């Protein structure tokens, strides 16, 4: 009888953590499930955006989301607002009776709404194409109506203090430095006689260049946890950026725009993600040319989502950050393009201009139409300032300089434009900074997620660094079968 009581007590306080999304073995689709004896929580629920066809991505997302029973989930905790961390959340409300509260950092709701609406629009459009092509009847993940339903469950919480969400669950947000309002999250689970703490990094910011990211809160380290579930997106030794490479790339941006736009009356397309990257690049351009009265080149922001998010930024930012943002947005050279007909007219005009248009990998959005116009023209230029997944259009252009044509949506386009690929503008923490941070955390185990095959080598190097500190923290490179018990 006594043994039976002890067994029951142990089960009652057991905590199981499973990385069920694409972040178990890849760099997108962040989703972690936390289960206790009576409760179920999710940390993030993002979209897998792999290097596959639209249909393959659809199937991958549906496969992982089926692992979640919507009616069981009580809280969904969000670290930051990129689509690969939040875009599948409304699917739970579309699939069944989900009443989970969605916990986000204070100030996030307006951006969350725009990201979900954009995701819904793109997915519904993609499903129409897939169904026509395959003569099938696939359902979209969710509709616009579902977005508004899910928004009713959103609850904003303050950072830098412990917030009790229930008798069992509390969290504390700490700045991650990745994008505006991005947070690490300390999750506290009360087991009765003891409390266990899990640190989730979400995505961490690039410390090397954080002083240049004027609209983003600086990264703050977390000192301890029972376990830490940490990203390792840029853990490769080959993918590093420093202040020195950043300075060189800033000089390159200036020289490219002066050469093509000022001297040759040509166009420079900068494919840019709507969230974070567009305001960041706009600020860079303003800092380079904003005080030059002779600089007359139009700066076009041609993306409906980017323009809506810029309005969100304007209402969220405060103090010096708000002042700097307003200064860049009021620059006389800036032209915001909303309507499709205005975008078509701008594309038809071959005169001097810099274009910021999404998406950054040329997978969707108006940047594809701009690419179709600019790529065949030897006088024009495409300037890439971010990572491109393998087999995306951006990747094919970067690696296809010897190809006479590039296929865009099934049609060949001449490949004549000048291509530049700048690599120092990553918003992710770099390899050595990750090692320095992770080895400083006092915890029992570190679980590496949100990384590719390079995380195995990174795991060994991190273990060596931890050992050099005379610490015994274990490091685990997560895979799709990893299950953590606390």
PLM region descriptions:
Residues 443-448:
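Proline-aspartate-enriched helix->loop->beta-strand connector
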Residues 365-371, 426-441:
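A short, acidic, amphipathic alpha-helical segment used as a generic capping/interface helix at domain edges
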Residues 9-77, 82, 86, 93-280, ...:
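His/Asp/Glu-rich metal-coordinating catalytic cores
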Residues 253-393, 449:
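Hard-cation-handling environments
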Residues 457-483:
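Short acidic, glycine/proline-enriched helix-loop-strand junctions
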Residues 406-434:
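Generic long, charged, amphipathic alpha-helical segments
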Residues 34-37, 188-190, 215-220, 284-291, ...:
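Short, solvent-exposed amphipathic alpha-helical segments in soluble enzyme
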């Amino acid at each position: 009888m006594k043994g039976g009581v002890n067994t029951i007590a142990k089960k009652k306080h057991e905590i199981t953590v499973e990385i069920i999304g694409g972040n178990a073995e890849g760099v997108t689709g962040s989703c972690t499930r936390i289960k206790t004896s009576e409760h179920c929580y999710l940390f993030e629920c993002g979209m897998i955006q792999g290097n596959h066809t639209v249909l393959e991505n659809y199937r991958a997302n549906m496969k992982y989301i089926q692992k979640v029973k919507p009616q069981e989930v009580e809280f969904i905790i969000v670290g930051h607002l990129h689509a690969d961390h939040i875009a599948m959340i409304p699917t739970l409300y579309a699939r069944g009776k989900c009443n989970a509260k969605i916990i986000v950092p204070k100030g996030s709701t307006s951006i969350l709404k725009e990201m979900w609406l954009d995701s819904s629009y793109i997915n519904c459009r993609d499903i129409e194409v897939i169904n026509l092509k395959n003569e099938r009847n696939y359902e979209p993940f969710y509709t616009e109506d579902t977005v508004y339903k899910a928004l009713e469950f959103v609850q904003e919480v303050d950072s830098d203090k412990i917030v009790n969400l229930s008798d069992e669950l509390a969290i504390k947000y700490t700045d991650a430095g990745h994008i505006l309002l991005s947070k690490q999250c300390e999750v506290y689970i009360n087991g009765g006689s003891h409390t266990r703490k899990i640190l989730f990094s979400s995505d961490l910011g690039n410390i090397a260049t954080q002083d240049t990211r004027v609209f983003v809160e600086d990264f703050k380290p977390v000192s301890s946890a029972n376990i830490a579930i940490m990203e390792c997106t840029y853990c490769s030794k080959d993918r590093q950026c420093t202040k020195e490479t950043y300075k060189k790339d800033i000089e390159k941006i200036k020289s490219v725009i002066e050469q093509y736009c000022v001297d040759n009356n040509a166009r420079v397309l900068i494919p840019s993600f709507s969230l974070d990257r567009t305001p960041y690049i706009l600020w860079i351009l303003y800092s380079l040319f904003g005080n030059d009265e002779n600089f007359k080149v139009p700066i076009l922001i041609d993306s409906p989502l980017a323009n809506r998010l810029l309005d969100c930024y304007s209402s969220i930012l405060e103090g010096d950050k708000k002042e700097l943002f307003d200064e860049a947005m009021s620059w006389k050279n800036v032209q915001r393009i909303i309507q499709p007909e205005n975008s078509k007219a701008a594309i038809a005009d071959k005169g001097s201009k810099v274009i910021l248009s999404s998406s950054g990998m040329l997978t969707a959005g108006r940047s594809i139409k701009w690419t179709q116009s600019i790529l065949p023209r030897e006088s024009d230029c495409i300037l890439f300032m971010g990572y491109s997944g393998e087999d995306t259009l951006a990747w094919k252009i970067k690696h296809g300089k010897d190809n006479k044509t590039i296929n865009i949506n099934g049609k060949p386009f001449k490949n004549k434009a000048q291509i530049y690929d700048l690599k120092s503008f990553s918003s992710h923490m770099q390899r050595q900074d990750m090692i320095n941070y992770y080895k400083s955390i006092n915890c029992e185990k570190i679980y590496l997620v949100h990384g590719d095959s390079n995380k195995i080598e990174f795991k060994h190097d991190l273990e060596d660094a931890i050992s050099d500190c005379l610490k015994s923290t274990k490091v685990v490179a997560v895979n799709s079968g990893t299950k953590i018990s606390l």
